[in-house]
A protein has these predicted regions:
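Short, hydrophobic beta-strand segments
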Residues: 104-107, 112, 116-125, 583-586, ...
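Short proline/glycine- and polar residue-rich coil/turn motifs
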Residues: 105-114, 572-577, 756-760, 772-773
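Aromatic-Pro/Gly-enriched surface loop or interdomain linker
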Residues: 126-209, 237, 241, 322, ...
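A glycine-rich, often tryptophan-bearing local segment used as a flexible ligand/cofactor-contacting loop or short
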Residues: 168, 177-180, 195-196, 205-298, ...
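A glycine-centered loop/beta-turn motif at secondary-structure junctions
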Residues: 199-200, 226-233, 285-389, 393, ...
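Accessory, solvent-exposed terminal regions and/or long lumenal/extracellular loops of proteins
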Residues: 364, 369-372, 452-743, 748
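Alpha-helical transmembrane signal-anchor/signal-peptide segments
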Residues: 427-448
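Cysteine-clustered segments with highest specificity for TGF-beta superfamily mature ligands
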Residues: 759-791, 800
Length: 804
């Protein structure tokens, strides 16, 4: 596979003439293959140059990228000439007709070679881009690359392995509502900033030396996992080199190997009848806290799983490239169950702060500043009244009393000038004297993850017409805001200077009393939030109970606890304070996520307009909950969250070389992972205990207003893995305005087909439930509508009872 595009120096043509004819043929074939390589995800560009400098670049993950994601470009520069103070720029023409570019410095002493990443945001129009090497303003070399930017519905799986052929089946897995692609990678293809990892949906590592992972790559991987990524690591005989750099992330602390002669339980887990009876080597150890064994054989764990934030880590103790797993058809099902499920994340985790609607709450939040609002009507009326009184009656009375009424031709212009200065000074003082950064942040943290992912919307307000250099440090990466405040630089340009862990937007132009905005992504240390929450599945109804403690130094203002069944207001949670929780999991609607910010905050949007801070919180929360045009339909999913406002001002973004003021609004969200109690003869799994996934963005378990012609499929899976022997009961709640127009089906895992269900009742009890539930607890429901009639569906949820 051709990974890098090289610009090389070709010698004298006489040298070619002296080559042996066989060598010439080899070179010709190599050039031919390079010219054909775009069909295979790569590309080769040859550029003759002088000066002894070689430039190489590779795009994305094996040439793949995704729209509205960061693209990592790996660059290698080699200098065999004199010392060179160069810069490398990655650029492309954006959708507005301007140039989007990222530039970084490259100090190149003689006989040196440097490799680094340059990061650029793909705005939806990126297909071809250029990597240029500059000496000042002089272009030394230029390399042209192409990127295959995939739709977000496509599942991109990266593979790092010395035996990549064993993972060919990954391209055949079928995620719900999409297809998959496989990117063959090396360790040095992995970027050092987690924002650029988000193009990858999953990563498979087997028979590869991960001990060479840098600390930055490891941290980026952990943050990517917490954002929803999935990591699949295989053991086997070469487990030591495979897990050398991943040990802390694995659900198992591996200590030794063990030979077994049968993997029948793994076959049963994926419901594949193929025998797995040959001897194989397992890399085994002890389960870590919070990890779960999904498949066990002869007393040892074969397949285990561990949650990391929104993501998951799977560990397979056997080697897929060795017998009996090599060529086994069941691996496809195993990969699908592990990697192809993508339950929707909460809206704040995927919000872009953009909106195609008439009103963008993000812009309203940015504009909620006293400097951008009108002065008080009383103040304006009072000033105008004073002007009228002084100019008219008072001026006349004074002149008449002094018997100098002929001076009116002088006093009236003088008063006009004086009051004009007063009005101007009033307006100038009202809009302020220093620039202000309106910084709106939402921070998402998780149990056991030291860093919180932060997404920030930052507005730069200026009282005068000026240009500012805005710098984001500590790994934060800026991208354009598509709202009316988003045109930061002239001629639709978006130029970023990248240096170490910082990025700078030079010459951000702001008009008088105007504002420009940008979006930042990065991470900050998480607050120490502790809890004793548990879910007892042996009780009916199931609920989340326990205590939540704020062990941080910050007060969480207007805190609330959210579950799939609703939310509870906790008030201000001060440092060291604790609160008791008891909330049901039963859910017939995503009540929190379908509510607007006014209902959640208990405020009237119109009444709060004079209160700038309350108006800013209201608009920002509305923007956070509006992840897309259809977010009100499908935003609610599994999750227990502590939410509150806090005073935190450590966002590492500011204006270089200028004094500025800050207005910080921080919404802090901590995902709480309850302990699971599975005591009792029967476990009750309520609707709120399932994580769901839909084949259509227009459909959720709680709403389906626009049903596709082919119907929709909902995949339900227990949010926390549980082990059970059999299924005692499976019920479907299908509530609609016209039940006779609907046909419902359940997926039969034994026959591999859809079974039609009776829909004469809102609660449908499914017979022989064991056939319709996979060993991992997954169930699938399909609903088709008679297109000749209108139907509004308000519930497609399931409940389950299992025997542990």
């Amino acid at each position: 596979m051709i990974r890098f595009v090289h610009a090389i120096k070709i010698g004298e043509t006489g040298l070619i003439a002296t080559l042996h004819s066989k060598t010439v043929k080899i070179i010709f074939v190599a050039i031919l293959l390079a010219s054909l390589s775009p069909a295979f995800g790569g590309q080769r560009f040859v550029h003759a140059q002088n000066g002894g400098v070689t430039l190489s670049a590779a795009a994305g993950f094996d040439g793949y990228c995704k729209d509205k994601r960061w693209l990592p470009v790996r660059v290698e520069v080699e200098n065999t000439g004199p010392d060179l103070d160069a810069s490398v720029q990655v650029s492309y023409q954006n959708s507005s007709g301007g140039i989007t570019s990222t530039t970084t410095e490259a100090q190149l002493p003689t006989s040196s070679r440097k490799a680094f990443f340059v990061y650029i945001f793909a705005d939806g129009s990126l297909r071809d881009f250029t990597v240029s090497l500059f000496d000042g303003k002089k272009v030394l070399q230029k390399v042209k690359l192409s990127a295959n930017c995939l739709a977000d519905t496509l599942l991109l799986v990266g593979v790092i392995s010395d035996t990549p052929a064993a993972f060919d089946g990954l391209s055949d897995i079928n995620p719900l509502g999409g297809t998959s692609r496989v990117a063959q990678l090396r360790i040095d293809d992995l970027p050092e900033r987690y924002q650029a990892w988000r193009t990858l949906d999953a990563l498979v590592v087997s028979n590869a030396d991960t001990g060479v992972l840098t600390a930055a790559q490891k941290q980026a991987m952990e943050l990517w996992l917490s954002s929803g990524g999935k990591l699949f690591v295989a053991g086997g005989a070469q487990w030591q080199r495979t897990t050398a750099g991943l040990n802390e992330l694995l659900p198992v602390e591996i200590r030794s190997t063990r030979n077994v002669t049968d993997l029948t339980n793994l076959s049963a887990y994926v419901e594949d009848e193929s025998p797995l009876s040959s001897q194989t080597t397992l890399a085994v150890g002890t389960m870590r806290e919070g990890a779960r064994a999904l498949v066990e054989e002869e007393g040892v764990s074969i397949l285990s799983q561990k949650n990391v934030g929104f993501g998951e880590v799977y560990y397979l103790a056997a080697d897929p490239s060795a017998n009996p797993l090599v060529g086994w058809a069941g691996m496809k099902t195993l990969y699908e169950q592990s990697l192809a499920t993508r339950p929707p994340l909460p809206p704040w985790a995927i919000s872009t702060f953009d909106s195609s609607g008439y009103s963008n709450p993000a812009e309203q939040a940015l504009g909620a500043m006293k400097e951008l609002s009108m002065p008080s009507i009383l103040y304006i009326c009072g000033l105008l009244g004073l002007y009228v009184v002084v100019m008219g009656p008072l001026n006349f009375l004074v002149l008449r009393r002094t018997k100098r009424r002929e001076l009116a031709w002088m006093t009236i212009p003088a008063l006009v000038i004086i009051f004009s200065c007063v009005f101007y000074a009033t307006g100038f003082s009202f809009r302020g004297f220093t620039p202000i950064m309106n910084r709106l942040m939402v921070a998402q943290a998780w149990d056991g993850v030291p860093q919180a992912n932060v997404k920030a919307l930052v507005g730069v307000y200026s009282p005068v017409r000026a240009g500012y250099d805005v710098t984001a440090a500590e790994g934060f990466m800026p991208r354009a805001f598509s709202g009316s405040f988003g045109d930061l630089q002239a001629d639709n340009q978006w130029a970023v200077l990248q240096q170490d862990d910082s990025m700078t937007l030079p010459d951000t132009r702001v008009e008088i009393a105007g504002m420009k905005a940008l979006i930042l992504e990065g991470s900050l240390p998480a607050l120490p939030i502790s809890h004793t929450l548990t879910i007892d599945l042996g009780k009916t109804p199931s609920s989340v109970t326990g205590t939540v403690t704020n062990a941080s130094e910050f007060t969480l203002k207007d805190a609330m606890l959210i579950t799939p069944g609703g939310w509870k207001e906790l008030g201000d949670l001060k440092p060291g304070a604790s609160t008791d929780v008891n909330l049901f999991l039963t859910s017939s609607s995503s009540s929190f996520y379908s509510s607007n910010a006014g209902n959640i905050l208990n405020i009237n949007p119109i009444a709060i307009q004079p209160d700038v801070e309350a108006a800013r919180q209201y608009s920002f929360l509305q923007a956070v909950l509006s992840s897309s045009d259809y977010s009100y339909m499908n935003a609610g999913n599994w999750g227990v969250y502590l939410i509150g406002w806090m005073d935190r001002s450590d966002l590492p973004v500011g204006i270089d070389g200028r004094r500025y003021d800050r207005v910080d609004t921080v919404l802090y969200i901590h995902s709480l992972t309850p302990q699971l109690k599975t005591e009792g003869s029967v476990l009750n799994l309520p609707s709120g205990f399932f994580a769901w996934e839909s084949s259509s963005p227009l459909v959720s378990p709680y709403s389906a207003f626009e049903i596709p012609d082919e119907g929709y499929i909902l995949r339900f899976k227990p949010a926390m893995p549980i082990q059970f022997r059999s299924v005692q009961s499976l019920k479907l709640m299908l509530v609609s305005s016209n039940p006779s127009a609907l046909t419902a089906y359940a997926w039969n895992f034994e026959t591999g087909s859809w079974t039609r269900l009776a829909t004469d009742k809102m609660t449908i009890t499914i017979s022989n439930p064991d056939q319709f539930v996979a060993p991992n607890g997954e169930a699938r429901i399909r609903v088709v509508q008679d297109q000749s009639t209108y139907t509004e569906i308000t519930s497609t949820t399931i409940t389950m009872q299992v025997i542990p």
